[in-house]
Regions:
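Short, well-formed alpha-helical segments that are part of the catalytic scaffolds
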Residues: 13-27
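Short beta-strand/loop segment that forms part of the nucleotide-sugar
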Residues: 33-42, 62-64
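A conserved acidic beta->alpha catalytic loop
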Residues: 39-48, 90-91
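Glycine-rich, basic loop-to-helix element that forms the pyrophosphate-binding segment
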Residues: 62-78
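Short aromatic/hydrophobic "clamp" motif used to bind/position activated sugar donors
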Residues: 83
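Conserved donor NDP-sugar-binding/catalytic core segment of glycosyltransferases
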Residues: 95-125
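A recurrent flexible, glycine/aromatic-enriched loop bordering the glycosyltransferase active site
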Residues: 117-124, 135-154
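Acidic donor-binding loop at a coil-to-helix junction in glycosyltransferase catalytic cores
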Residues: 170-177
Length: 234
């Protein structure tokens, strides 16, 4: 896998989460010495947590920044045909998720793969909200791909062709880039990544639903993306 895949993890002040992600990566089958770039801009103890939890993982910490900048910094270093972006707060429910999605990308000659979301902190409301999002995204993906940036596997050449993540926008970089891909070359397989309820706790369930709907309705409105206040989400 190390000759095919590069993993990029954007990170900022994730001392309570990054250790769990690294544990999940250590348990992934076939990962071997796959290069993992953690693009970090933390001011907390994140780097110490990384050092304590790296194990056998082939990790290199590089300069981070805003989400798009951090992801692009890592992708720029990739020399493999595929690059996988994973958020620092992600967990997995299967030890074969990376191996399986990489196989699907190659076998079906796809350009982009995203995953469904599942809540791991036992919040019933978040579980329902994620479930509704999964259904909606699956339906809309027939016309407009959206690989949630928490797990976004792409061909490196296509990523570069589309210009990478848009640095000029403060958030929703995953949505803006995803919709440039062909729906025929996109897949959401039967795998999940896990996240907790923290963004719902910050924005509220109605607030999050409104945020996603407004972004969708303004998907081609340049001025909308430029004026988004990322602090409301992050």
């Amino acid at each position: 896998m190390e000759n095919k895949l590069t993993i990029v993890v954007p990170c900022k002040d994730e001392e309570n989460y990054i250790g769990h992600l690294l544990a999940a990566l250590r348990s992934q089958e076939g990962l071997g010495s796959t290069k993992i770039y953690i693009a970090d801009a933390s001011t907390d103890s994140t780097r110490q947590v990384i050092a304590l939890n790296s194990g056998h993982l082939n990790i290199e910490i590089i300069e981070g920044g805003l989400v798009s900048v951090a992801k692009n910094n890592g992708a720029r270093l990739a020399t493999t045909p595929y690059v996988l972006f994973i958020d620092a707060d992600v967990r997995f429910f299967s030890s074969t998720v990376i191996k399986d999605t990489l196989h699907l990308l190659e076998e079906r000659n796809l350009d982009l793969i995203g995953l469904k979301i599942k809540c791991y902190d036992n919040s019933i409301r978040s579980t329902i909200a994620f479930g509704l999002f999964n259904i909606t995204n699956k339906v809309l993906s027939r016309w407009m791909p959206f690989a949630v940036g928490a797990y976004m596997l792409t061909r490196t050449d296509k990523f570069n062709e589309y210009g990478g993540f848009p640095n000029k926008y403060p958030t929703s970089e995953d949505f803006i880039l995803s919709k440039m891909y062909s729906p025929k070359k996109f897949l959401i397989p039967d795998h999940y990544f896990g996240q907790d309820s923290r963004r719902f706790n910050k924005m509220g369930y109605f607030g999050m639903a409104k945020y996603l709907l407004v972004n969708f309705l303004n998907r081609n409105n340049e001025s909308h993306w430029k004026k988004i206040d990322a602090k409301k989400y992050w």
